[in-house]
Amino acid sequence: MLTTFLNNLMMAMTMVTMTAPAQPQMTTVATAIDSNPNKASKDASDPRAYLNEIDGDKAMTWVEAHNLSTVDKLSKDPRYSEYQADALTILQATDRIASPSFARNGMIDNFWQDGTHVQGLWRRTTWESYRSGNPQWRTILDVDALSKAEGKTWVFEGADCLPPTSNLCLIRLSDGGKDADVVREFDIAKGEFVKEGFVLPEGKQSVTWVDENTIYVTREWTLGEVTSSGYAYVTKVVKRGQSLDQAVEIFRGQKKDVSAERGVLRDIDGKYVMDTSYRGLDFFNTELAFYPNGHTDTRKVVLPLPTTAVFSSYYKGQAIYWLKSDWTSAKGTVFHNGAIIAFDLKAALADPARVEPLVLFMPNEHQSVAGTTQTKNRLVLSILSNVTSEVRSFDFGKGGWSSFKLALPENSTLSLTSSDDESDQLFVFSEGFLEPSTLFCADAATGQVEKITSTPERFDAGGLQAQQFWATSKDGTKVPYFLVARKDVKLDGTNPTILYAYGGFQIPMQPSYSAVLGKLWLEKGGAYALANIRGGGEFGPKWHDAGLKTNRQRVYDDFQAVAQDLIAKKVTSTPHLGIMGGSNGGLLMGVQMIQRPDLWNAVVIQVPLLDMVNFTRMSAGASWQGEYGSPDDPVEGAFLRSISPYHNVKAGVAYPEPFFETSTKDDRVGPVHARKMAALFEDMGLPFYYYENIEGGHAAAANLQEHARRYALEYTYMFQKLMDNK
């Protein structure tokens, strides 16, 4: 399939080139144009408006022409085919760890993709077979066979199985990787879709089991009945055998919400506890309500907690919340942001005003909570301390709360992969930049830890080392970053270096073993830096909040400070420094390219936001106003315009030649940001690379082959920009 695709690209190149309109002479310095949004009035016509039509003929002609041009240029480099082959070998390796997930009755599930199973297999084995090292798998669903039979490129998005047996599952399938999906009922015991079972057509929707014959469905029931973010806010009850037009409304949020839905709270055994409802007021504020008297209860109870508090677990009758802001209880007790708190849920619902939690964990200034999970009898927390991990197991009994630390590897990234609700076992991955992923099975009750398997080394890390450094940002804040380079690295400013970061939505960036990065870059003499800038979750809510809305320049200052520290240490210099980031990190890259074009020689901008004046009217952009602010607010809007990459390309300025990457089927951020930014560069005579995967959603790839092609394009570009000039 991949070879055919590339051959078609090459065959079509001549025809596209012949029909493409004449373009401005490309230089590294932007030329002045009347349609530059930096100068054009708000009411001026937009010559790039046709690119707003995702699948429009004119837009797709533009996309295809630039795809062809980019692939043609980069694939002529002999390294391209080498990188693609190496990446595909790594991604499709049959000796990689089959990531496990606990299923019922001592079974282990896995979703597997390789060269034969491009779209993947959902499969199952016994725990004994899995730990043997040579598991015998039974296929539950062959997504490739289903795709072929139905003429689709189905991407498996997961399954919600009805407890306690978990035989009936609601499977979510996305056409090409979009956020919108279809839902179908599947019987695992029979290995087939349920005849005349529950089926939901494509949409951005959520679905919850109530019982074997009832589901709650939140979707766009009436055309246009979605929030400004494009998500549903009306939940209806659907009974087995009913058509969707027979569904009965049970809950309605508000159109101004980000999203809203009615759901079900269950205990660890899968037993029904009560109904809940959720309203996303913005990305970080929610109204969570409980209905203590069951499905027919119309009396909702909202606890007097901050709307930023996150409901994490229901454990032994205790509600576990993660505080994202300070809160004072009715008794006057101050609970600080970042804390994990617990209280008796049913008692709190009976008398909400008297909620008085206990603190399970309060991070210090160097710590944050990375996640929580639950086994049959234990509550488990993953904790970051200076961006390295530890895992603690908590118990609640007659004597109150107690906890201990699990004996897992120190100074590594620990990921809670899956926990068992029928025992106290959980799977934990441990990894580092130079340490391949190792899978452990831990018993959260006894503390026993067993190594199950490890990923083979995919690149030569013998001469490499990973170190943590701290840069000083513009306002004096110390910002950590990791540097992976050769132990004997010459500090002469010529080391080709990729700097990566995200810096948003309280998402921490941690060390991880990237075999592709190691094989295609580190092994060949490149250095890699990972910046833990503000906006992320490395040090809890305060670290994130410091970069919200009109404070976002701090995020960009942090990134620049890390770059300047690398240059000051003579690790690298502008001719050899490239940057890369995706989604919110794509916005970060766009801002860096515009604000400090003198610092970088290569910029990879993946699935980005770039038009911050209009982002709320593009795809799901309205849902991120809690992070970025509102363009319609006078103060926030003025700031957003000042940092919007699309509105700050200036004539007479020399910019590095960027590489824009996006996906036609990305219905979260959407491809329009990247399209219009690239088109603006084109109109201003600036060179660039552009690649828009026709499938793949916000991940920009729908299968392993597409990921391999993307890696080959990116690293060929990086080598040309950063290594070929040594």
Where are these regions (language model features)?
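Non-catalytic accessory segments flanking enzyme active sites
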Residues: D57-C161, R172, S259-P292, T296-K324, ...
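Asp-box/WD-like beta-propeller blade repeats and closely related beta-sheet repeat scaffolds
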Residues: Q136-G158, C169-L173, K178-T214, T218-V226, ...
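Blade-edge beta-strand/turn elements of extracellular beta-propeller
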Residues: W137, I188-L200, Q242-Q254, Y291-L303, ...
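Polar, glycine-rich mid-to-C-terminal structural blocks
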Residues: A232-R279
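Active-site-proximal cap/loop segments of hydrolase catalytic domains
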Residues: L517, E523-K524, L530-K726
